[in-house]
Amino acid sequence: MVAGSILPIAIFKGKLYFLFGKENSMEDSSKGFSDFGGGCENKESPFETALREGGEELSGFLGDGDTIRRLIKQNGGTYKILHNDYNVHIFRMEYDENLPKYYNLNHKFLWERMNKNILNDSKLFEKIEVQWFSIDQMRIRKREFRKFYQEIVDLFIDNYSDIKNFIQSRIMKSGNKKTRSNKK
């Protein structure tokens, strides 16, 4: 099955950080961390799927598909990694160390108070938590990723220099050599 995903990446203190989400406890097929994506529906392109799934799986924290599309365009486009029929669309965003805290607290609050079947069926709580991972953390914690996704993690590790060059070139093109978080 052809699939598409988004993977936000930021630079903080000279290091790349990848934003991954962890499947909720009701996910039976493959537990663990991965990016934000899924299978193509109704003749969608992998990129259109990535935008839709990104909005759903991040519960709007980066906006809906149209907002994510604008964010990607504003930040220089995507670096694409293809693994079998799985299309990862990597893009730059500003590092926000609090994003996981706000996302995770919000989801924990709602998850504990709402009917789990309704939440699971809504597709709004596919990811129960998000975390920033450095490349070193990805190596150390690789077994915490979904089984199928561990091979994709290897591709990120193998292509780290190219990914970092892509992200840095997007910062230079935007004229923003330092993000707010990097100015500290």
Each predicted region: which residue ranges?
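Short, charged/polar surface micro-motifs in flexible loops or helix N-caps
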Residues: K13-K15, S25-E27, E41, M93-L99
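Nudix hydrolase/Nudix homology domain
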Residues: E27-K31, N98-K184
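Functional cleft and adjacent loop/helix regions within the main domain
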Residues: D28-F36, N42, Y79-I81, I90, ...
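The catalytic Nudix box helix
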Residues: D35-N75, H89
